[in-house]
Amino acid sequence: MALTIAAAPAKAETIEVTIEKLVFSPATVEAKVGDTIEWVNKDVFAHTATIKGGWEVTIPPKKAASLTLKTAGSVDYFCRFHPNMKGRLTVTSP
């Protein structure tokens, strides 16, 4: 009789990034493919999480918006309305 051991699949997580006073916090996030990043905007004006030539998430004032990560890699993002706001996502395979 053979014994088979299977690892349970990793559960996807939701990682919160707060936006307050024109700052992404934390500015650097490590995540896995399948995780969701949720940006929570505490400011009174809209922001974006934008990758040049890639995706853009618009986060309305006093609201949240999210994105599920589909590919591994490292990307820098910024707010299109406030270009000094910057963040970095490092996404690895599960």
Where are each of the predicted segments found?
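Extracytoplasmic copper-binding redox domains, predominantly the cupredoxin/blue-copper superfamily
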Residues: 2-94
